[in-house]
A protein has these predicted regions:
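Gly/Ser-rich oxyanion-binding loop with an adjacent helix/lid
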Residues: 1-22, 27-32, 38-41, 79-81, ...
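Short Gly/aromatic-enriched secondary-structure transition segments
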Residues: 39-46, 224-225
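Short, charge-rich binding segments
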Residues: 44-46, 54-57, 88, 105
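FabD-like malonyl-/acyl-CoA
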Residues: 129-130, 337-342
């Protein structure tokens, strides 16, 4: 669907057929929130919602892009002029990725792009990284380069940090680049070593949107990162990944109580992510559910990134799932989605419970879908 829409938008805008189509998935993080930029551990899986870029070469040094999902908004940028903010927010991601590829000598001399996707915006499912990885892969292929997935992820993260203004970690870009069908990935965000963790065949991943959109290009998200860096400096460690709970509790005197809570979330969330990978590999959904519940409480009370609507949605899901699995907020916070991991034979009952028991602040029902774990970036 997205491939056909992207190709059609390309033909309308540029009057020719695209040379290639590239897709990159969104993702859902099962556990490990705000640990990536602390050099910690995360456990996401790529999902069957994606962004597709239809791409073709140009020889005029310009990058022209059109977004099928924004009423055909377009952008025109001189690739040799250095990054400059665009009129449209989505185009900053496109320009940012192109700029870092140009600096790395991996971009073509000019390109035409048409973009279509179905990763819900502002949902915590990483529509931004999906776009970045699809654009980066498409431009590199047009330029005759096959980028290693890890490097592609690092370049895309750099684009978002430097040109969009969100000081995100590497998780979203890594899972979009390296996702494996049927698996979650335990990612060590310091070494970038990934462990493929099979999802139990009898488990379903349910995603429900709270109806509250978030935006992470600054503000509260970046504040959390600064607080984590303050805590790391207090304890004289390179990152909070290097801190254990005993040291945290013994050495917290003199640290701002808010910063101490932020650090406690990261330290305990790292431990939960590692334990969750083992529970998932063993097919132990009840243990996974306990870890997800603890993660949500930590995000609510220590990291303070949930909102009342998300807390309500998670409570509805947890009540419907019971001890058979779990649910938690997923994504950077301040709105977005909840994720549930449940026995497949309970998926319909959980979806029905959400439909009957939750309403967004505007009175609308939650958007709910059962997703499957897919592979990372590829030709569409």
């Amino acid at each position: 669907m997205n491939a056909a829409r992207a190709a059609a938008a390309y033909r309308r805008q540029f009057g020719s057929e695209p040379a290639l189509l590239v897709r990159a998935p969104g993702r859902v993080n099962l556990i490990g929130e705000h640990t990536d930029y602390n050099d910690g551990f995360v456990l996401p899986c790529a999902i069957d919602r994606d962004t597709v870029v239809a791409a073709g070469l140009a020889d005029d040094g310009r990058l022209r892009s059109v977004a099928a999902d924004f009423a055909g908004e377009d952008d025109d940028w001189n690739m040799s002029s250095g990054f400059a903010a665009a009129r449209h927010g989505w185009a900053d991601y496109v320009r940012g990725v192109a700029a870092v590829l140009c600096e790395a000598g991996l971009a073509p001399g000019g390109a035409r792009l048409a973009i279509a996707g179905n990763v819900p915006l502002g949902s915590g499912l990483s529509s931004s990284a999906s776009l970045e990885i699809a654009v980066g892969s498409a431009l590199a292929r047009l330029g005759g380069s096959e980028i290693d997935p890890d490097r592609l992820a690092q370049l895309a993260q750099r684009a978002e940090n430097e040109h969009v203004g969100c000081q995100c970690g590497i998780m979203d870009q890594m899972i979009a680049a390296r996702g494996i069908a049927g698996h979650a990935l335990l990612i060590d965000c310091r070494s970038l070593v990934c462990r493929a963790v099979p999802l139990p065949s009898d488990a379903a991943v349910i995603i429900a949107h709270s109806g509250v959109r978030h935006a992470h290009a600054g503000g509260e998200y970046n504040d959390r990162r600064r607080q984590c860096e303050d805590a790391a400096r207090h304890f004289s460690v390179a990152a909070l990944r290097d801190l254990d709970l005993i040291t945290l509790e013994r050495g917290g005197a003199g640290l701002d109580p808010v910063v101490l809570r932020r650090a406690r979330h990261v330290v305990t969330e790292n431990a939960r992510a590692l334990a969750a990978a083992d529970a998932l590999a063993a097919g132990d959904l009840p243990a996974m559910g306990e870890l997800m519940a603890a993660s949500h409480l930590s995000m609510r009370d220590d990291f303070e990134i949930t909102v009342p609507a998300v807390d309500e949605l998670v409570a509805v899901m947890q009540a419907a799932i019971g001890p058979a699995g779990g649910a938690r907020m997923t994504g950077g916070g301040f709105g977005g989605c909840a994720v549930g991991l449940v026995p497949r034979d309970r998926a319909d009952a959980v979806c029905n419970a959400i439909a009957q028991g939750y309403r967004a602040p505007d009175g609308s029902a939650a958007e709910v879908f059962v997703c499957r774990a897919t592979g990372g970036v590829s030709l569409a």
